[in-house]
Amino acid sequence: MTTTAIYGVGAMGGAILDGLTAHGEGEVLAVARTPERAAEMRERYADRPAVEVVDAAVAAARADVHLVAVKPYAVADLLAQVRDYLGPGSVVVSLALGVSLADLVTALPDGVAAVRAMPNTPARVGQGMTVLSPAADVTDEQLQLVREVLAPTGGTLVLPEVQQGAATALSGSAPAYFYLVVEAMVDAGVAQGLTRADALALAGQAARGAGAMLVETGEEAALLRAQVTSPGGSTAAALARLEAHGVRHALADAVATCADRAG
């Protein structure tokens, strides 16, 4: 059975940890930054025996797959701290934005594989997507192991490292775009007389259903949109207002800006 270590249990690391422990199998070693955070983690996961809160050296020595979820500025110090404890054949997966494969390979000892990854927070509920970019010497078996470890958190997609910026814009940061849209819809629903709870239930399920339609049918978004849009109807009128306000252009600009920052 695979042992997975998670270094850093903030927003992203915590989401991955929750996804793994709620839906997966195997031992999970959680490494917190401070003793206070470690105590908090022990209390939070007291009912999940698969989770053990340990220090970084212990996690490095025991784990097969190492998920590095600390802030980008802290990656180099963490890897320097654990490199002498990492076992040959183990895999280090960095979730830190902007930390390149070259940086990882340089920081790791020979025989330890490096993978750059970008997950997203829906991993917490098993509906995430993690984009993986393996170093050249990562074996098919090691990459498959990483995919199996992350499977409880959602899907995985393997892309070359040069596409990590675009992937971040379309996946890593994308939940925030949808939350903003739903937030605006809920506010508008309240203005139309709905309670906030009812507006959130309606808009949230619409977002969930639309996402499922895209993934499960494999059809283009434009085709699915057309199926909902009757000529001269209320949906067509609403979409015309969105186009008039430049929503399509704003989204394209947001994605490009995010990709530039993340690349």
Identify the residue ranges that each predicted region occupies.
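NAD(P)+-binding Rossmann beta1-loop-alpha1 motif at the extreme N-terminus of oxidoreductases
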Residues: 1-57, 61, 190-192
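Hydrophobic/aromatic beta-strand patches that form the interior of the parallel beta-sheet core
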Residues: 29-31, 93, 115-117, 157
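Active-site capping/gating segments
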Residues: 31, 116-131
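Rossmann-fold NAD(P) dinucleotide-binding segment
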Residues: 55-108
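NAD(P)-dependent Rossmann-like dehydrogenase/reductase catalytic/cofactor-binding core
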Residues: 204-263
